[in-house]
Curated annotation (Swiss-Prot):
Phosphorylated. The keyword Repeat applies. This is mRNA decay activator protein ZFP36L2-A. Disulfide bonds: none annotated. It comes from Xenopus laevis (African clawed frog). Residues 328-347 have a biased composition (Low complexity). The keyword Cytoplasm applies. Gene3D superfamilies: Zinc finger, CCCH-type. One of its GO terms (molecular function) is zinc ion binding.
């Protein structure tokens, strides 16, 4: 009886130890499940863990220890003790290996990141910014020394000072903030104008060169640029040369003086020619500022002989007149004030002032 009872207690003790070992394995599998792992399909969740870590020797030991079911563990007490010891040591080894591996990974990664940062800093020192060495170093100017040395981003002397490439519109527009509230947070580094001394001339906004005309008013080319100011001020214009109209009047005077009895119907006295000459000069002056015309300003109709003239009688001329008393006045000016019609009655208000002394009489 006593042997039977002892064997029963012994079996209960073994079962208790086996359950405790299985609980430890289940706890270890839960810890592995929180870590990075791959799922493993199993039929018995109490015997096999749900997630196993990759490249882990402790999991292999756990699997080898857990493959023996509890019903096969009643043969030897030493085997059970060895199994429990192996499971506990496997748990400790797994945790230690995980910590060692994580520490080594983090250490290598941190060293790699530190190496990359050092390389980036070296590359950043080689690749200069747009404002590199464009301003003088204040500590170097004041004390003659700088704690950054060669790595300083500012110029240590005028020989290291570089010219800064500005935007084309730099300092060409007023700073709205400064001129609105009287303060600008950017200070002297602002890209807009604060004072009149900072104003820069915008590119392409300079004074355009004055156009020099290649042709003068008379149509002849100017060979010197000194005559260009004549085109700018209207008071500097020289009087126009004589035109064909004034020359025509002079030729008409000479013709009347040389040939007093010529076969032409237009015979003007000195007083009438004095009235015509200012009209010709005025017409010539007005045509000087326009496009020059090929024809003279005063055009006369073809002159007719005395026998072909109409019924108008010439008025008595003064004693000093060179005209023939028997000749008749015929034709008209280009304005058409006197027509060559056969009608003896004409309106006196429509005639020009130079013909106001003419009288119309019937045959």
């Amino acid at each position: 009886m006593s042997a039977t009872l002892l064997s029963a207690f012994y079996d209960i003790d073994l079962l208790y130890k086996n359950e405790k070992a299985l609980n430890n394995l289940a706890l270890s599998t839960m810890l592995d499940k929180k870590a990075v792992g791959s799922p493993v399909s199993s039929t018995n969740s109490n015997l096999f863990p749900g997630f196993l870590r990759r490249h882990s020797a402790s999991n292999l030991q756990a699997l080898s220890g857990s493959t023996n079911p509890a019903k096969f563990c009643h043969n030897n007490n030493n085997n059970q003790l060895n199994e429990s010891a192996a499971s506990s040591t496997a748990l400790l080894n797994r945790e230690n290996k995980f910590r060692d591996r994580s520490f080594s990974e983090n250490g290598e990664r941190s060293q790699h990141l530190l190496h990359l940062q050092q390389q980036q800093q070296k590359a950043g020192a080689q690749v200069n910014s747009t404002r590199y060495k464009t301003e003088l170093c204040r500590p170097f100017e004041e004390s003659g020394a700088c704690k950054y040395g060669e790595k300083c981003q500012f110029a240590h002397g005028f020989h290291e000072l570089r010219s800064l490439t500005r935007h084309p519109k730099y300092k060409t527009e007023l700073c709205r903030t400064f001129h609105t509230i009287g303060f600008c947070p950017y200070g002297p580094r602002c890209h807009f104008i604060h004072n009149a001394e900072e104003r820069r001339q915008a590119p392409g906004a300079g004074e355009r060169p004055k156009l020099h005309h290649s042709l003068s008013f008379s149509g002849f080319p100017n060979h010197s640029l000194d005559s260009a100011p004549l085109l700018e001020s209207p008071t500097s214009r020289t009087p126009p040369p004589q035109s064909s109209g004034s020359l025509y009047c002079q030729e008409l005077l000479q013709l009347n003086n040389n040939n007093p009895c010529a076969n032409n119907a237009f015979t003007f006295s000195g007083q009438e020619l004095g009235l015509i000459t200012p009209l010709a000069i005025h017409t010539q002056n007005s045509s000087y500022f326009r496009q020059p015309s090929s024809s003279p300003p005063l055009s006369f109709q073809p002159l007719r002989k005395v026998s072909e003239s109409p019924v108008f009688d010439a008025p008595p001329s003064p004693p000093d007149s060179l005209s023939d008393r028997d000749s008749y006045l015929s034709g008209s000016l280009s304005s058409g004030s006197l027509s060559g019609s056969d009608s003896p009655t004409l309106d006196s208000n429509r005639r020009l002032p130079i013909f106001s002394r003419l009288s119309i009489s019937d045959d």
